[in-house]
Structure formats: C-alpha cells, structure tokens
C-alpha cells in the first residue's frame, strides 16, 4: 500500500451513501464497510473529520409545500441521526469518535468548538460534524467546506454514487465525458455537479482541493488518500 498523500482529511458522505442500494434509511452492512475503511485511515495515521448528509431520511428541498427554513432544520436533524449511526458503527470497530453539532443538543453530542475538534483530531479521534452549518439555506456540502477550512484539512474527499465529475449525467447519457482534473472556475462556469456554488467558492477561496470519487467500492476511500488515480480532482491548478 502506498504512503498516505494527506495528513488530515474531510470526508463528505451523502446520506444516500449510508442507505446503500436501498435509497432510504440505513444499509448497516454497507455502513460497516465504510467504517472499516475509515478505521484503516486512522490506523495509517490520517486525521479524519466527516460530514454526513441527510438525504436518506429527508431533503430540505423535498418539503416544497413547507416553509423553507423549517424544511432545512428538519434536514439538519436528519444529519444528526446519520452522524450517530456512523459513530456507533465506528465505535463497534474500536474507533474513538466524537460527534459535534452546529445546533446544541448536549445530551447526544458536543457543540461544535473548533479548538476542541482540532484536539480530538490530534488525538486520533474521528470527528463527525452534524447539523450542517446550523443555518437554513446552506447545504451539507457547504458545511463540509466550512469545517474543512476551520480544521485546516488538506483535502475534501467527496464520496458520491458516481465515480467522478462528468460533463452530463452518466446515468442518462452513454457519451458522458469524465474529467480527471478540473479547476474551481471551470466547475462554476460550466455548472458542473460537484458541490453547490457556495461550497465550491469557499473551497476555491481557501485553496482546499476536492477529490470526487465513487463509493461503489468502499476501498476507494483508501485509494483516494494514497494518491491512486481515481475520480476527479478539483483544485486551483488544473
């Protein structure tokens, strides 16, 4: 196995990633596979922060008949459920973890405190950041970019259901072209589906590369941190 390319990473998992092929709820076997890969990262000496979406339970934009703010807060609560599920899965493997939330719920998690999060990472604890940014109208992608900047992560590992960034939906178009490398400006100008524009701009301003790869094989997480050719790398230099 190659030496790790990064010392501190931010892993962004969609809620759908925890649901596996089900698309809703939890696939505990698949969640365990992801946790096993995270454990390997820790064993390699890599400090791991994680942000989990809530799309397997609720999406703010799904509540079209609801007040947007209320729908977004429901989505934040969904990310907390996912964070606890991931924490439990990791701890069953003997991985020390902490969940920190942007909205205080001290009975189940710590409030987000940057210095405390940094200390946990230095002590080889996986820190799972939940409830997004704590504000409506911001996605969990933006939360991942924000927390990555705050903890000074070397890279955002963006695990998706597709194996990189394409010029159009590869599930709909057989001639979709995959990119190996992109600049942030290209992503924004072409409206490519990496992160939303707020998250992408935040990464660009703070020079945080984004590595987009597929979770069809959980071992891709290891490949991503050891520098293997995988997915699409988005950075300030193409």
Swiss-Prot record:
Q: Which InterPro entries match?
A: AceGlu_kinase-like_sf, Asp/Glu/Uridylate_kinase, Uridylate_kinase, Uridylate_kinase_bac
Q: In which pathway does it act?
A: Pyrimidine metabolism; CTP biosynthesis via de novo pathway; UDP from UMP (UMPK route): step 1/1
Q: Which organism is it from?
A: Clostridium botulinum (strain Langeland / NCTC 10281 / Type F)
Q: Extract the coiled-coil ranges from the record.
A: none
Q: Which UniProt keywords apply?
A: Allosteric enzyme, ATP-binding, Cytoplasm, Kinase, Nucleotide-binding, Pyrimidine biosynthesis, Transferase
Query: What is the designated name of this protein?
Result: Uridylate kinase
Give any single GO term for biological process.
UDP biosynthetic process
What function does this protein fulfil?
Catalyzes the reversible phosphorylation of UMP to UDP.
Q: Which gene encodes it?
A: pyrH
Question: Which protein family is named in the record?
Answer: Belongs to the UMP kinase family.
